[in-house]
Amino acid sequence: MITHNFNTLDLLTSPVWIVSPFEEQLIYANSAARLLMQDLTFSQLRTGPYSVSSQKELPKYLSDLQNQHDIIEILTVQRKEEETALSCRLVLRELTETEPVIIFEGIEAPATLGLKASRSANYQRKKQGFYARFFLTNSAPMLLIDPSRDGQIVDANLAALNFYGYNHETMCQKHTWEINMLGRRVMPIMHEISHLPGGHKPLNFIHKLADGSTRHVQTYAGPIEIYGDKLMLCIVHDITEQKRLEEQLEHAAHHDAMTGLLNRRQFYHITEPGQMQHLAIAQDYSLLLIDTDRFKHINDLYGHSKGDEVLCALARTLESCARKGDLVFRWGGEEFVLLLPRTPLDTALSLAETIRVSVAKVSISGLPRFTVSIGVAHHEGNESIDELFKRVDDALYRAKNDGRNRVLAA
């Protein structure tokens, strides 16, 4: 598929989005998709109130898509000025030999599949047969849900009762929206899932237990007909520990281990053009580059552990001086960066002076006072982040050469 053929997708009545997985940027949306987006970005479609997915980051889908696994995401779209849910099937295609794209194709539920009242109010679990043995003895929590009765839970196996902490009678008096942290917002999502054939990758939710605690869960849900009742079978897997480890790894990838500040890698990620637009700071922002004066002397004379104390104390001082929305990074060694959204040069200079004065007051046991030099620059026109950084680095160099413990503008 090449660029000049994208317009042919406008002939389709189903919505189609073509997305670059690595930049997570929308390449093309056909007319049906644009109608559902209104003023929303594709990122907002994936993170809206009705949005559910297996993975937050699109590159994590690539292996499964290459192996032709069935992957579904539910997006939050606009219909008649109201937000609602839309199921999409994901497919991997090669735009070029080196550039794969993920195609999100909307799955519109046929009108004949509207939810109809079932007989599940009279549902009685039978103790014999394959289904009963499978349901009762399975070690995974399982729920039978009736979407047509407001998400009523009509049966739960022993593993589910143990997981949620309810007895069978209480569990079967509940609706799925009562155990899902989305509350009633889960109903349009359930409506979408009830139309899918099953077999797709699981979706992630947060469920609430009887004791009030919450757990991250992965749910395999699909339609099933049992004893003449058209229900949904939901298999629940607790992924709380997995999520905790993922969050720890993600934090480690984006943050400096010693100071806890954002790291240089995250700075470059945030200042990518697409990210800057998302943060609404593409033009009007300033940059501070802060260097600890005579830091090598501190390390040589007092030891590296004291040097680490200086860096951590400086990090906390920068955080305390930063305003809401400012971003603080450890650049490397004894250098730090502040990204100041919607900040003109004079305001940035004033903040830099506040930082300089505050740092000079920091007291660390066993050490003399230390100071910082700060370069300041405001983004100009269409200059790149590298061009801006060179200007602020030059300003810092002049501040160091002019005697240190001072603030200079580019």
Swiss-Prot record:
Enzyme class: transferase
Annotated GO biological process: cell adhesion involved in single-species biofilm formation; negative regulation of bacterial-type flagellum-dependent cell motility
Co-factor requirement: Mg(2+)
EC numbers on record: 2.7.7.65
Catalytically driven reaction(s): 2 GTP = 3',3'-c-di-GMP + 2 diphosphate
Catalytic residue positions: E334 (proton acceptor)
Annotated keywords: GTP-binding, Magnesium, Metal-binding, Nucleotide-binding, Repeat, Transferase
Pathway: Purine metabolism; 3',5'-cyclic di-GMP biosynthesis
CDD domains to which the protein is assigned, alphabetical: GGDEF, PAS
Domain PAC: 199-251
Site (Transition state stabilizer): K296
Domain PAS: from-to ranges: 3-70, 129-198
Keyword Nucleotide-binding part of the UniProt annotation: yes
Cofactor-binding details, from the entry: Binds 1 Mg(2+) ion per monomer.
UniProt entry tagged with the keyword Heme: no
GO CC, one annotated term: plasma membrane
Binding site for substrate: N299, H304, D308
One example GO MF annotation: metal ion binding
Superkingdom, natural source: Bacteria
Binding-site residues for Mg(2+), renumbered to this chain: D291, E334
Domain GGDEF: 283-410
Role: Part of a signaling cascade that regulates curli biosynthesis. The cascade is composed of two cyclic-di-GMP (c-di-GMP) control modules, in which c-di-GMP controlled by the DgcE/PdeH pair (module I) regulates the activity of the DgcM/PdeR pair (module II), which in turn regulates activity of the transcription factor MlrA and expression of the master biofilm regulator csgD.
Protein name: Diguanylate cyclase DgcM
Originating gene: dgcM
